Amino acid sequence: MKLIESLRVKEKAYIEKLENGLTVIIIPKNTTNKKYIIWGTNFGSIDNHFIMPNTNEEVYIPDGVAHFLEHKMFEQSNGTNSLDTLMALGIDANAYTTNDHTAYLFECTDKFYEGLDELMDYVQNPYFTDENVEKEKGIIGQEIRMYDDDPGWQLYMQILDCLYKKNEIKIDIAGTVESISKITPDVLQKCYDTFYHPSNMVMVICGDFVPEEILEEVKKRLKPKQNQGEIKRIYEAEENGINKKYNEKVK
């Protein structure tokens, strides 16, 4: 493992890139009882046009897929929800989506390896059906409408719309009610297969760990996959100048 050390802040990190492409960063800290892990994929709201590495298929997806996929990852085929399972263990777990990445995380003082089992199980084994995807559209649709009534969020989105003509940063992370209506299990599976590959992901672990030992624990739980290489993302070329001087939105 490669060691990176900062004498100024007295911190060190060990970095290892596995054969399947996954980057693992381990930050040993023996001064705290807390243990923390975050597993992220470089897939966010701006990634709506790409070429699948293994098939060279050019894919366009509806706005909001990265966020939709984050919501669906916790649901298991046996009817359980991994977020509930982690909380029942006393583990504080969460997930989030941004413009350029999605991440799954938890922190705990106890039962870290039980949490690691659950995290690495649900992130590597998605469960999509016509029924559960349709159900999620209603849930996320309510979330979108909630943000439509949030003045701060609307101010932020309207500013982006004024600043940019084509840049994907303008896309609302959750998409729109119309765009998520076009999401299907097939769309989710294509995006999962492309962006949730280890070669497009980073895992960071912090706590009182021996770096070599925790790295082996991660390796034992990884499904065997070959490094797929870099994903070709296609973005709109932004034009010079602002899009408009101001926006008006009245409800």
State the predicted function of each range:
Residues 1-81, 189-251:
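His/Glu-rich zincin catalytic helix
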Residues 2, 77-191:
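Acidic/histidine-enriched segments that form metal/cofactor-coordinating
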